[in-house]
C-alpha cells in the first residue's frame, strides 16, 4: 500500500528521485490487462498521497520561512511575503498560484483533518479536496471542521461522493450551519458579475452579449485558504 511504500522511514530527495526513475519502467513490460488497470489505480492513489505530503511539507516550509523572517527583523506586515511564490516555483507553477497552494495546504492540515486523511490514503483526488476547501472557506473554523467531519461520516466516507456530489453536500451542510455566510458569499459573487458586449461575427451583423466575472469570485479565490477566524454564528 501507498502508506507502507518506504516502511515508515525518513524519505529523502534521493529516495523520491530513485522512485521516479522506477516509474519510468511501467508500461514497458508484458503485464496483462488486470495488472495494467491495477497499476493505473495505484498510481492515482500515489498522486493523492503525494498531494497530501506536499500539503504537509508546504505548511512546514512556510513556518520555517516565517520564523526566519522574524529572526531577521522583517516587519510584521511583510512576514510570509514570497513564501507562496517559492512553493509555486517548486511545483513548476505560476507565482500567482502560490497563495492558493499555500492556502489549501493550511486548510487541509489545520481545519480539514478528515479530508486530508482521505487524500493521504489515496481515497480522493487533490481536486476533490480542493472542492471541499473551497465550499467551506466562508465558514468559521468550528463550522468548517464540522462539515469535514459530517462528510467523512457518510456511508463510504468522502470517497463515496463524486466531485459534484461532494461540492453540493459540503455546500448544503455549510448552509445549514451558517446560512448567513453562504448567502453573503453568493451575494458578493453576484455583485462581481458584469454584462459585457462584444462585436458579433460578421454574418450576424450585430453585437453579442454575455455575462462575465470582472475577476474570479472572491470566495472561490479564497476557497483554498483557511477559514476566517471569527466566532461561529448560530444557524
Label every PLM stretch briefly.
Residues 1-235:
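Conserved C-terminal region and hinge/linker of Rieske [2Fe-2S] proteins, especially
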